[in-house]
From Swiss-Prot:
Positions of Mn(2+) 1 binding: D408, E506, E520
Taxonomic source organism: Schizosaccharomyces pombe (strain 972 / ATCC 24843) (Fission yeast)
Free-text cofactor note: Binds 2 manganese ions per subunit.
Binding positions for Mn(2+) 2 per the UniProt entry: D397, D408, E520
GO MF terms held by the record: metal ion binding; metalloaminopeptidase activity
Protein name: Uncharacterized peptidase C22G7.01c
Length: 598
């Protein structure tokens, strides 16, 4: 649906003129650099009409540009009105939004941005780039101009109660996590560490919340020194159970007090992550803060034994729900019934809700038929979504939050007869998926270094996909978790893959206007016993967590090697052996058919 943004832009430009801004930048993120935001923080979506999870809007006196990546080109082109220019990131000749700001400004002109919505390193780099290339000035505004335009209709910020993540799922207590953090701080020679990422706060204190849809986190900051810890959170969210849980470890203070405490602090060596906002950095003093790789991010990414146990168990239960759903949908459609994409997604959620550890979805289900599958992050509308066409490819990317883990799985199905091109491209993507599943690599390897394995077979035919190959997955936390992941962007070269990390493995192929195919398993990284250990290195590999059948109608066996056939048959055998005892009679029969040897 297209939102007409002319009036909103006119009001914003009036405010820009009052403050002397040539350009005003509206990022996607909230004050905690979150990828997914609550409704009150969806400022870029409000001003532009584009509601994908990634993108940046830059507004000028007569211009409005929306920058996003390949996952959202189709969606953005459908949602932006005539006031906007879509800037397709990664295409030759298309600047980044930062480069665009330098191109569109002159000496002494001002570029405005809410200082809480840009990270300190990004603000510092942009400030220097503007000064050197155009002579313009970056202004960190303490007001948000979009909020002013939004006015009274802006949604209220959530006030959901916090819950305690039980030690049997968390694996480590708050005292142990604080001890480990302080040891890391000593190694870095810092007096304090500012925790600003919401999933890091939640993980550190074994708490979960519901402030951001699909992500069990809550708005908070934390300041940890070598002998004290402070949690800045709206105290209306804190239950007696939470207070008891934190007693003796951390002092609870009002959320907004973090800024005054920062300004009055005597600390001089303060560690911050690269995701900490410019506003926080300036509150402490830019000369006092040191951007470092967050020790919490590293610890959180490597799942402990309890977290891995939970991830394995929740993926089994989730696999059962997915099989029950596809068995039901297959029978329903082939009996001549009709159902739209949204109602099908709702039915899948109903199967997941039958599990008593179910806490919600981990993202909005991508239930897409035919050409909608080519929209990589498609969301079926509640009203007017397409009827699932059994003669076309159906792509379903879904996941759930359970008390013991988080899931994310994509299966692409055909309930009729696919074309040769559909089978060919699906098989090429599946071959890339298998190549990653079977890889053995030395410790120290990054996700950036192995991304090519997933794309190689598509590349041979001059094909590719415009998204990353894998992202980290939290443990009853965010379904997208950095720095873990596999992809061609620099961020995936920043930290090596390590045993205990969980990532997705999800190559795909998309033909605009026709269909999309994606195959996604969650995997965990584990040590591999190799015959040799060159230079004494440890070798690692991937182990599937996701258990769900692949659509054999979309597999062309003539394109598979004997090793790939062996992998698929062994995987399907594991799927059937593990899931079948917990399935209904009809789902068990369906699964037997769809896990038969190739």
């Amino acid at each position: 649906m297209v939102v007409h943004t002319g009036n909103r832009l006119n009001k914003l430009r009036e405010l820009m003129k009052e403050r002397g801004y040539t350009l005003y930048v509206v990022p996607s993120e909230d004050a905690h650099s979150s990828e997914y935001t609550c409704d009150a923080d969806a400022r870029r979506a409000f001003i532009s009409g584009f509601d994908g999870s990634a993108g940046c809007a830059v507004i000028g006196e007569t211009s409005a540009a929306l920058f996003t990546d390949g996952r959202y080109f189709n969606q953005a082109s459908q949602q932006l009105d005539e006031n906007w220019t879509l800037m397709k990131q990664g295409f030759t000749g298309v600047p980044t939004w930062e480069e665009y700001c330098t191109q569109m400004t002159k000496c002494n002109e001002k570029v405005g941005i809410d200082s809480s919505l840009i990270t300190f390193p990004a603000a510092k780099a942009l400030r220097e780039s503007l000064f050197l290339k155009s002579g313009a000035v970056l202004v960190g505004d303490h007001d948000n101009l979009v909020d002013i335009v939004w006015g009274a209709s802006r949604p209220k910020e959530p006030l959901e109660k916090l819950i305690v993540q039980e030690i049997k799922y968390a694996g480590l207590g708050v005292d142990e996590k604080l001890h480990n953090l302080r040891e890391a701080m000593k190694e870095q020679k810092i007096e304090a560490f500012v925790v600003s990422m919401l999933d890091e706060v939640a993980w550190l204190y074994n708490l979960r919340g519901a402030d951001v849809p699909y992500n069990p986190v809550f708005f908070a900051y934390s300041l940890v020194t070598l002998d004290e810890a402070f949690l800045y959170v709206d105290e209306r969210k804190v239950t007696p159970e939470v207070s008891k849980h934190l007693d003796g470890f951390v002092k609870i203070l009002p959320y907004d007090r973090v800024f005054s405490d920062a300004k009055n602090s005597n600390l001089t060596r303060i560690g911050i992550s690269s995701k900490t906002s410019w506003c926080i950095a300036t509150s402490f003093g830019e000369t006092k803060v040191m951007p470092i790789l967050s020790p919490i991010s590293q610890a959180k990414g490597i799942k402990n034994d309890a977290e891995l146990k939970g991830m394995k168990e929740c993926h089994i239960r989730d696999g059962c729900a997915l099989v029950e759903y596809f068995a039901w949908l297959d029978e329903y459609l082939n009996s001549g019934n009709k159902i739209n994409e949204f109602d099908a997604a709702t039915k899948l959620e109903q199967f997941r809700r039958k599990n008593n550890l179910f806490m919600g979805l981990s993202f909005e289900t991508i239930s897409s038929t035919g050409p909608n599958g080519a929209v990589i992050h498609y969301s079926p509308p509640a009203t007017g979504s397409a009827i699932i066409d059994p003669t076309k490819i159906y792509l379903c990317d879904s996941g759930a939050q359970y008390k013991d883990g988080t899931t994310d799985v994509t299966r692409t199905w055909h309930f009729g007869e696919p074309s040769e091109f559909e089978r060919q491209t699906a098989t090429l993507a599946l071959k890339g998926h298998i190549a990653l599943a079977n890889i053995v690599f030395p410790k120290g390897t990054t996700g950036y270094m192995i991304d090519v394995l997933a794309r190689q077979y598509l590349w041979k035919y001059g094909l590719d996909y415009l998204h990353g190959t894998g992202h980290g997955v939290g443990s009853f936390l965010n379904v997208h978790e950095l720095p873990v992941g596999i992809g061609s962007r620099e961020v995936f070269n920043s930290a090596p893959l390590q045993a205990g990390m969980v990532t997705s493995n999800e190559p795909g192929f998309y033909e605009d206007g026709h269909f999309g195919y994606r195959v996604e398993n969650c995997v965990y990284i584990t040590e591999v016993n190799t015959e040799n250990r060159f230079a004494g290195r440890t070798y690692l590999g991937l182990k599937d967590l996701t258990l769900a059948p692949h659509c054999q109608k979309l597999i062309d066996p003539s394109l598979l090697s004997p090793e790939e056939v062996k992998y698929l048959n062994e995987y399907h055998s594991e799927v059937y052996t593990t899931l079948s005892p917990m399935l209904s009679v009809s789902a068990k029969k369906w699964l037997s058919k769809h896990t038969s040897p190739i």
